[in-house]
Amino acid sequence: MNRHPALSLDLDDGIDRKVLGQLRQRFLAVNSGRLQRARQALSSRQERVLRLLPLLFHINHPLLPGYLSASTPAGLSGFEADDEVLAEAQRLARSFVYKPRRQEPAQQPIHGLFLMGSLGSLAQEEQSDLDLWVCHAPELEPGARQELRRKCALIEDWARSQGSEVHCFLIDVARFGQDEREDRKEPGGDGNTQHFLLLDEFYRSAIWLGGRTPLWWLVPPAHERRYDEYCRTLLGKRFIRAEEVLDLGHLAHIPAREFIGAGLWQLSKAIDSPYKSLLKLLLTEAYASEHPRVRCVALRFKEQVFAGQLDLDELDPYVLVYRHLERYLREQQAPERLELVRRCLYLKVGRKLGGRQRQAQKGWQHLSMERLVAEWQWEPRRLALLDSRSQWKMRQVMEERRTVVNELTYSYRLLFQIARQQGADSGIDSRDLGLLGRRLYAAFERKAGKVENINPGIAPDLGEDVLTLVQLPADDDREQAQWAIFPGALGAHQWPDYAPLKRSLRLVELLAWCHRNGVIDSATRLSLHPGQSDLGDAELDNLLGSLRQFLPVPLATVDDADLLQPRRLKSVLLLVNVGVDPLRHHSQMNLHMATGRTDVLGYAGVRDNLVLTLDQLSLNSWNELTVRHYAGPQALPECLAEFLDAVREKPGSPPQPPELMVRCFCRNRAAAIAVRVEELFRETYGQLLGGQPSRYLLQIRQQYHLLEMSPEAVSHESLPDLPSLLQHLGRERDGYSALKLDRHALEGEDLGLILSMGRPDCIQVFYRRDFDSAEISLLDERNALWRQRQALRDERSLLAPLQRFLQSLLYRRNALSLEEQVPASLDIRYYELLSNDGRLHVEPREAPEALAGPALYELQALLERGERKRVQVTLYCDHQEFSELEYGAGLFKAVARHILAHRAESEPYPCYLTDLDLSRLFADEQPQTLHYLRYKSVLETALNQALLEQ
């Protein structure tokens, strides 16, 4: 059956009916050989299913599977049940009696049954599915098609009970030829853009079970472009009868959109299962390189049948694909890629050739692969390596991964380039290309902090039985300590002689990598050499348990909907103080500290910070796992600010809060640390969800940290002491910003009480009397802080000047509100800070009456820009003008003399501004109260100094 005379057909020379018959018999002989090979790998029950399928579609019998009613579409064109099939049916149903149908073949609704997939091929497995094409007459009514679908479902159920997975696909022959399939779930494709490539696969690999045979068989491969002309002649001149053939179309032309679309589809599948998809991926690449004159594999198959080359091994669908790729890659001078194709084919077939096996026990697949491997000149060592794939560990997988990733990346770039060259003709939406690009990026792109997935379907299990975890000390070769993982159980004097599987500066990053890639699983035993760290076996076990809880592997495939959106955090694991004892000194001395100050951010009398390090593991919606390490005094606020900035609501995206886990397993105060950190993160996240600009004040030891939150960004500023905090709080603001205090911030400070009472659209005045002086604090309408200490004579003289000034501002503001759409009038509220048994509290006070009097001399200031942007001052005392234009540097002395001349009392006392105009300084915006108070303080200081000097 290896070599037969070549056969040819030519319309111009006339068609020989005998040659047509010989061609049909050749294709049927190849089909018979494939069917026989398919049966060899099946169990007796599975073989029964295969034998009975034509009969089940030929008749409706209540004793046989698939029966719905006598009127359900049935009747396989030209089918006659032989004795072997009838005997099989009677073994299934003893009382079954076969009654031949009296329909003419042309009237029978089932035109053909074909098996697709790997059955009968080199890659057939014990559990290969049976993908069955049920080709039916185009005139079937919708109701009849629905009945046929139900019949198919019943047959699938019965086959499943026999240990076979059968999947039926209804094919309307006429519509299929016009690329209008009714079943868009065909095997091996995305179902939408691969019509001709699917037809190519059908013609080269389908096994005919019964009914009409493909008309395509009888059209010479050299004349594929005259397919329609040949078909008209063969049918019109009755060289063949119409009821003997079915026409699914030709392969003269494959549109660019098909091989680009198929390449994208296969590339997407190859990310998780490279060996299963790389062959088809490279095939589409080869087709794309030949476009527009593609000689697809099915045509080469037909060429060999016409040429009389009927060796079943060489006509095997997978060998045909391999030969096509071999030619293509040799032309491309790509031997490394050809070797990858060979490995993919070898692993796809799954026959281990490295071990010894008796010749009589070798199946046809084994023998066929032996011939190929001998042709490739593979050494036994290579076979042994591939045969042990199930035992491959990290080093072998890493080496193979480099090749696979390079191949996938190259294929994507090539497809992208071809799609751009084809432009609109490619039929590929840029969305699809972008989607796949993101999928590749998420799976394989390296970036700082990202935990690599080294095993994209290369080996089934990377788990190690025993590993050694070591902290490598800093030395001449290493500027700082590192962590490394070694295979096996190594002692302290052994590991320096071995190469580690993986090393990292950070322990958590190393453990996350081991867990993500399955190197450490629940059965792995670990030997620990902690070095200078405080890591113990119990903490290590807890860390690994937390990783397993946080990141169950393998991860689910990312949905397209997620890839179409920007990345967002799905879940976060915070590990606090990994390998660090925050109270190491006490632990070494075996001391237990008793204290009433238990906050872990200000612990005991010295206000120690017990949160020394944080490791944040983040899983985003693209399944990217990243690790970030934070250490030092800024660790917690930096981690918190970056977390909040990552989870803040993005424009156009609804808020989707990530799952948050916080764990701490250090020796001292672990539970309290974890609870405190988690509460802090949840509280600030809740504040962020408010959607309005706001601030959060955190105190760690004696240092303050202010988080600025807005829909646009989250930032963090550290302030080393209280004066720095006051200066920061006194900055002008663009709008109101609420300020929330951590529950332990500013404990015992009156500032904490003041800041916690901030309200919008309100000016709040707080005062605290201390013997001969008082401190006034004011929160303006934008929640900015102004603070001033001044001499205290009595409560009236303390507050009345300020009230008079604030009322003047409100009058000015109200007058502008109608013209410039300034917000409505503000409330002015007064509070006194009092101490009761050492505990501060606040009591509201009535606003003082701003009556005219000696201390409330009418004094107005007007400021405007002079030359070189210098502020120029004009003062009005009882409506008399004093300007710098007239008095120059002596302005304040002139005003002081005027004031003293009008005083009845000789005793000096301060003077206060009663009104201030800044409209010339803030022409484009409304100044906030803070601006007025700043200028007021400067002017009053200068005036009162001049009064003292008189």
Sequence positions of predicted segments:
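Short, conserved secondary-structure transition motifs
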Residues: S164-E186
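Acidic, Ser/Thr-rich peripheral helices and adjacent loops at domain boundaries
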Residues: P187-H195
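Amphipathic alpha-helical scaffolding segments
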Residues: L130-L140, E147-A153, R342-R343, Q359-R371
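Catalytic metal-binding acidic patch
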Residues: F114-G117, S121-E147, E165-L170
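Short, charged/polar micro-motifs that form catalytic or ligand-binding hotspots
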Residues: Q103, C135-R145, R327-A334
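Well-ordered mid-protein domain cores that form the structural environment of catalytic cofactors
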Residues: L68-Q127
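Nucleotidyltransferase catalytic cores
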Residues: M1-R91, D179-D183, L199-Q950
